[in-house]
């Protein structure tokens, strides 16, 4: 019996269910939207609000909410596998990473990450207040490259409930992005969750290395005194912003 998963919204889960094979097929056909039947259109509509360039769907597997991310036609490297490996590496390094899973169905890779902005209650899901770094800083998409990790640190100081813990976590995430060459570290890929009293850094998400040939690498956000230069030296030079000394 194939494992079935259910697309969902903010209310009770709808009755229509899909196997992982059907999801993988839908993700492939989503690149030719006119081929989709009505039920699969509803499924992909549930995933369209998640953002990003890759086909994805919001689902429930068992009683847990997940995001399923699929191969994209024309991928030059196995991005689903690379993201899984990178996130597992981040977890091994002590970063806050949600539960992960991986399936290969009909020769299509499916990367799965458990949602941390929903709380399951039987057949419906409670929304946890979530804000991206873009929202927390009151920024606009057109000006994201003018912001820095120091600005995110400022938001943690202003709105956070566990300031020191989250400052150190943010610094480690910046180092990870430098070391794995993740240059998609824009403000939407940093999140905050409301804990009832204030805001905490959300668990890590959307960290994917990008192959690069150049010797000089840059992140989207500013790193340290040398701006967006993706070097450990630049990060360490600005460590005081994160309440870290050079000895730390």
Regions found by a protein language model. Give the residues of each.
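Phosphate/dinucleotide-binding and metal-coordinating scaffold of catalytic cores
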Residues: 1-187, 191-248
């Amino acid at each position: 019996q194939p494992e079935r998963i259910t697309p969902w919204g903010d209310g009770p889960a709808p009755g229509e269910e899909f196997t992982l094979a059907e999801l993988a097929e839908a993700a492939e056909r989503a690149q030719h939207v006119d081929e989709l039947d009505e039920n699969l259109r509803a499924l992909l509509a549930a995933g369209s609000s998640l953002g990003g360039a890759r086909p994805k769907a919001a689902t429930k597997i068992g009683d847990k909410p997940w995001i399923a991310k699929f191969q994209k036609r024309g991928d030059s490297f196995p991005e689903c596998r690379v993201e899984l490996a990178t996130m597992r590496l981040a977890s091994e390094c002590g970063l806050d990473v949600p539960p992960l899973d991986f399936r290969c169905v009909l020769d299509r890779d499916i990367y799965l990450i458990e949602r941390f902005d929903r709380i399951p209650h039987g057949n419906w899901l409670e929304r946890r207040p979530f804000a991206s770094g873009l929202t927390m800083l009151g920024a606009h998409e057109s000006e994201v490259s003018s912001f820095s990790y120091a600005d995110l640190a400022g938001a943690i100081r202003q709105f956070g409930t566990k300031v020191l813990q989250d400052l150190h976590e943010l610094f480690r995430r910046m180092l990870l992005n430098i070391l794995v060459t993740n240059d998609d570290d824009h403000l939407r890929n940093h999140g905050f969750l409301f804990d009832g009293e204030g805001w905490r850094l959300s668990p890590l998400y959307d960290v994917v290395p990008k192959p690069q040939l150049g010797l000089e690498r840059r992140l989207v956000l500013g790193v340290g005194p040398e701006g967006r230069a993706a070097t450990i030296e630049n990060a360490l030079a600005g460590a005081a912003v994160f309440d870290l000394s050079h000895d730390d």
